[in-house]
């Protein structure tokens, strides 16, 4: 199973799961799944994690500092089809109209978006789609704070890639009973 995790899920793991993991079992399980490639962290997600809550993710999950285990996204080149998706499905056209964004400004926004962890999660998911990847995020489909590009769950739906939250991943895919890990 290829599970690609975003920064919000890493932060949720650190904030809401680790404090109850008195025995270290849960952290050890997460580390094992990361080291054997079941949990994938993109280089862009790692870089973003450095700046979230004073680097708490990297402090608590020190094993993810091994850059050899990260997926390098520099070779991910968006295809013509991806650009079409970006312009037509991933984009919130109502917001573009509402903000009066010009074509030049929209091109700049696309360029900025393509450099984000979110866009790279989608690109990488498409590149390994034959392996049925799962994207893990704590984002929801609703309310996007007037951002031009839709959130990860909505975009995953557009490209037919499974997307779930951390609790769903643990329960349904990893078959983990969290209550047994916190003792």
Task: Tell where the protein language model's regions lie, with residue ranges.
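Acidic, PIN/NYN-like endoribonuclease modules and their adjacent C-terminal/linker elements
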Residues: 130-132, 141-183
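Extreme N-terminal starter segment of soluble prokaryotic enzymes
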Residues: 1-3
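Active-site-proximal, substrate-binding regions of enzyme catalytic domains
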Residues: 7-133, 141-142
